Regions:
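Loop-rich non-cytosolic ectodomains and luminal regions
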Residues: 1-167
Length: 167
């Protein structure tokens, strides 16, 4: 009931780390991050992911963003009073194939979300029993072909959950 949306703009990877730290309740004073005593957000949601890990020279799950995500998700990791935050990321759009999950969604402590299909049926009138979006019913509730898949490079099964991402 008291949920609020806290938008944080991140145009490059450094902004992402600053945004996560700030949202998790840390304040930057003279380039030193200290916990303020209360997170500004309980859940941080990222609708993005980086698919092409060779550019980062590290394996997804062991890259800097994934490691920071894991640390911020762990209670008492950066301060004795720090409760941790839940960080959710899109699984990415690297498509079908084994181990296409990228970063930071390959973090072992983050929650990654993959995409499934949905064909909601119209139950009335001339369109009774027809898919709402004009698709056929054969591909209902399947993993979307563009959705990234696991396992992560460190062996974690990913994505952690699936939700409607296409019609």
């Amino acid at each position: 009931p008291d949920a609020k949306i806290l938008p944080v703009k991140a145009l490059w990877l450094g902004d992402t780390v600053y945004g996560w730290l700030w949202s998790a309740g840390f304040e930057n004073t003279d380039n030193h991050w200290t916990f303020s005593g209360k997170p500004k957000a309980d859940i941080i949601s990222n609708s993005w992911g980086i698919s092409n890990f060779p550019l980062s020279n590290t394996s997804p799950g062991m890259d800097v963003l994934s490691l920071i995500l894991s640390i911020l998700s762990t209670p008492h990791s950066l301060d004795n009073d720090y409760p941790g935050v839940t960080i959710i990321s899109s699984a990415g759009n690297s498509g079908h194939g084994y181990g296409t999950i990228g970063l930071p969604n390959a973090s072992p402590f983050g929650i990654s979300v993959g995409a499934t299909t949905n064909n909601v049926f119209v139950g009335y009138g001339p369109f009774k029993d027809q898919p709402r979006f004009g698709n056929n019913t054969v591909h209902y509730d399947h993993v979307v072909d563009f959705s990234s898949r696991g396992p992560s490079s460190i062996g974690d099964p990913k994505p952690d959950i699936m939700s409607i991402g296409a019609h």
